[in-house]
């Protein structure tokens, strides 16, 4: 089974998307790469819901052909977020997306309706508002006691929320929580 780990993407001059998976020869992403497209499509849909909705609306004309429809969504997402060839940090490692500032002639002009929706999208957290608030405080380097004091809750309640956050996001420490917050540009 394909895993979202050690994958690098980059745009070709002709507009294609090259994919380099560790241990494999690089290839151009095509609609026939069902396994990779399927796992990326599902991950985008679950974790970058705003970007997914925008792209699914943009490509709704292709929805009658599901594999091509998913390919178009994944290809555009990759072109807008992983298009630069980067040798220092892979684009996807351990189910974490490392977005790049892809050069785009439309960036900052107001001409692209998908700017800041698809490119560098906001991560969709499967957390309650209270959990997000507590997560944000940990990311701001507050400790459990400080968070409990600010929210007028017991440290046991804060620990329970932290445990729930870590469980939902498959994180194992406060350090991993902070890295996750930072890597996903959460606010």
Q: Predicted segment positions?
A:
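Basic, Lys/Arg-enriched C-terminal extension of HTH/homeodomain DNA-binding domains
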Residues: 166-187
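DNA-contacting interfaces and partner/effector-binding or oligomerization modules
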Residues: 1-115
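Residues within the DNA-recognition helix of helix-turn-helix
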Residues: 161-164
């Amino acid at each position: 089974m394909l895993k979202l780990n050690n994958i690098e993407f980059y745009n070709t001059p002709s507009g294609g998307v090259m994919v380099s998976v560790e241990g494999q020869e690089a290839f151009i992403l095509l609609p026939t790469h069902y396994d990779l497209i399927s796992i990326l499509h599902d991950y985008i849909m679950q974790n970058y819901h705003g970007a997914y909705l925008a792209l699914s609306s943009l490509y709704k004309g292709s929805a009658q052909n599901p594999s091509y429809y998913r390919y178009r969504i994944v290809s555009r997402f990759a072109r807008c977020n992983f298009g630069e060839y980067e040798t220092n940090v892979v684009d996807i490692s351990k189910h974490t997306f490392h977005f790049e500032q892809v050069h785009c002639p439309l960036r900052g002009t107001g001409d692209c309706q998908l700017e800041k929706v698809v490119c560098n999208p906001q991560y969709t957290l499967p957390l309650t508002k209270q959990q997000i608030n507590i997560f944000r405080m940990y990311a701001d380097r507050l400790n459990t006691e400080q968070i409990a004091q600010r929210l007028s809750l017991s440290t046991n309640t804060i620990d329970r929320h932290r445990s729930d956050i870590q469980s939902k996001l498959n994180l194992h420490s406060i350090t991993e929580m902070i890295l996750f917050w930072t890597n996903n540009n959460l606010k």
